[in-house]
Amino acid sequence: ACGGGGGDVGSLISASLFDQMLKYRNDPRCCXXGF
């Protein structure tokens, strides 16, 4: 489960959820604005 590459993250997070994270990343209302 602990791979040396960061590509494993894509397989752990669903594409739809990842897209939401990208949207909220630019959302000033989100606490994780630094993400």
Curated annotation (Swiss-Prot):
It catalyses: Random endo-hydrolysis of N-acetyl-beta-D-glucosaminide (1->4)-beta-linkages in chitin and chitodextrins. Its EC number is 3.2.1.14. GO terms for biological process: chitin catabolic process; defense response; polysaccharide catabolic process. GO terms for molecular function: endochitinase activity. Keywords: Carbohydrate metabolism, Chitin degradation, Glycosidase, Hydrolase, Plant defense, Polysaccharide degradation. Defense against chitin-containing fungal pathogens. Belongs to the glycosyl hydrolase 19 family. Chitinase class I subfamily. This is Basic endochitinase CH1.
